[in-house]
């Protein structure tokens, strides 16, 4: 399956159904009066995060989503059927942006989260609504209110616990294939990996997800190489394994290059927990490995873990350290979730507060049912008779 991590789609909620002009006609009832029903409400457009998807490829073939309109009202005061909501399913980790690609509408980071992108229009009033003491046979009915339409961008940021970063050919895909059942493309040339890959690691009765992203080069945050577009997929990671190829001459320079790109990308990536790893140690003699570890440790100011994804040497230690970071991050998220509560995640969120027919001027209630207004303005009839209040 092809990987696609961003897509632009058009959504339109359903229009409301039209109100009905009808009159009661039965035997021995000469003047039955109006009984036209209201139109049904248009369908909403809802986006839902589901756990069994990991790409936005489906939106390459369908970009327009239009919800059903409400059914028209009919006689005997029958309200039209409301439209059934259109559910757009997206992978967990999908962010929704406005057409400018900068304004975030929603971030669906948990399975089952929903957001209503477009609210269906109200149905129009039937003529029974307009019956009054002075107009007992109204022939007026309202059309349904139009739904909302909007263009949005979907951007997928994969949900992973740990991320693999480094220059091209640092051995990231080889490591992913060695510790998981993922089978990424592996070859001895730069930019073999063209899109992110995920795998599940099982280590000491624990499991976590790691993400392998395409390699970074100098100037990537300015668009060089494949750019930093794919760095978004490790923004949610608890820890980053920064892999440096032991066979290159300047291991300290390689570390500085990637760190500069992380800082240039922003989003706090340069502040994440980092494990510095020297890979491909099976290709060099022990004395060379020791010298490169010392050079790299001096540059980064932290311990360096040496390993080989081919021979497996040192790999278990790296995975244990990664698992420890992941466990700590999960415990922190769990404690934070208990403190804040998850009720807001379970409820469906509305994107906009735009009305689609609610509180319209034609909706009237009796004075007796209306909120009392005690200011000095003449808001209505002062005669004391039962009047009408427009909201």
Curated annotation (Swiss-Prot):
Q: Which residues form the OBG-type G domain?
A: 160-327
Q: Which UniProt keywords apply?
A: Cytoplasm, GTP-binding, Hydrolase, Magnesium, Metal-binding, Nucleotide-binding
Compositional bias per record (Acidic residues), positions renumbered to this chain: 366-382
| Record region (Disordered) | 352-391
What subcellular compartments does it reside in? Cytoplasm
Q: Which residues form a coiled coil?
A: none
Q: Which GO terms describe its molecular function?
A: GTP binding; GTPase activity; magnesium ion binding
* InterPro entries (alphabetical): G_OBG, GTP-bd, GTP-bd_Obg/CgtA, GTP1-OBG_CS, GTP1_OBG_dom, GTP1_OBG_dom_sf, OBG_GTPase, P-loop_NTPase
Cross-referenced SUPFAM superfamilies: Obg GTP-binding protein N-terminal domain (SSF82051), P-loop containing nucleoside triphosphate hydrolases (SSF52540)
Instruction: State the protein's purpose.
Output: An essential GTPase which binds GTP, GDP and possibly (p)ppGpp with moderate affinity, with high nucleotide exchange rates and a fairly low GTP hydrolysis rate. Plays a role in control of the cell cycle, stress response, ribosome biogenesis and in those bacteria that undergo differentiation, in morphogenesis control.
Give the family per the record: Belongs to the TRAFAC class OBG-HflX-like GTPase superfamily. OBG GTPase family.
Checking HAMAP family in the record gives:
GTPase_Obg (MF_01454)
From the Swiss-Prot or TrEMBL record, give the protein name: GTPase Obg
Where does this protein come from, organism-wise? Rhodospirillum rubrum (strain ATCC 11170 / ATH 1.1.1 / DSM 467 / LMG 4362 / NCIMB 8255 / S1)
């Amino acid at each position: 399956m092809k990987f696609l991590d961003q897509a632009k789609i058009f959504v339109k909620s359903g229009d409301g159904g039209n109100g009905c002009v009808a009159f009661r006609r039965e035997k021995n009832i000469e003047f039955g009066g109006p009984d036209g029903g209201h139109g049904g409400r248009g369908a909403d457009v809802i986006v839902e995060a589901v756990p069994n998807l990991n790409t936005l490829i489906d939106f390459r073939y369908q970009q327009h989503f239009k919800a059903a309109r409400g059914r028209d009202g009919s006689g005997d005061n029958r309200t039209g059927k409301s439209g059934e909501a259109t559910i757009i399913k997206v992978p967990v980790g999908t962010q929704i942006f406005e057409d400018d690609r900068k304004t975030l509408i929603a971030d669906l980071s948990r399975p089952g989260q929903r957001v209503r992108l477009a609210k269906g229009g109200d149905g129009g009033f039937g003529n029974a609504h307009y019956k009054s003491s002075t107009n007992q046979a109204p022939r007026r009915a309202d059309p349904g209110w139009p739904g909302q339409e909007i263009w949005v961008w979907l951007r997928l940021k994969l949900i992973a616990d740990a991320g693999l970063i480094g220059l091209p050919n640092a051995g990231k895909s080889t490591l992913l294939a060695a510790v998981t059942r993922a089978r990424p493309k592996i070859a001895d040339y730069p930019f073999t990996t063209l899109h992110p890959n995920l795998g599940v690691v099982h280590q000491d009765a624990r499991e976590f997800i790691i993400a392998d992203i395409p390699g970074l080069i100098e100037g990537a945050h300015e668009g060089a190489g494949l750019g930093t577009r794919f760095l978004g997929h490790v923004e949610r990671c608890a820890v980053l394994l920064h892999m440096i190829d032991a066979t290159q001459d300047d291991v300290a320079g390689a570390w500085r290059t990637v760190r500069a790109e992380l800082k240039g990308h922003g989003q706090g990536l340069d502040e994440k927990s980092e494990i510095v790893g020297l890979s491909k140690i099976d290709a060099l003699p022990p004395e060379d490995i020791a010298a490169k570890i010392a050079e790299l440790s001096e540059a980064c100011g932290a311990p360096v873990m040496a390993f080989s994804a081919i021979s497996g040497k040192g790999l278990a230690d790296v995975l244990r350290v990664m698992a420890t970071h992941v466990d700590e991050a999960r415990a922190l998220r769990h404690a934070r979730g208990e403190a804040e509560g998850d009720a807001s995640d379970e409820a469906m969120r509305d994107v906009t507060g735009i009305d689609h027919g609610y509180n319209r001027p034609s909706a009237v209630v009796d004075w007796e049912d209306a909120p009392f207004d005690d200011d000095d303005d003449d808001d209505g009839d002062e005669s004391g008779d039962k009047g009408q209040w427009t909201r």
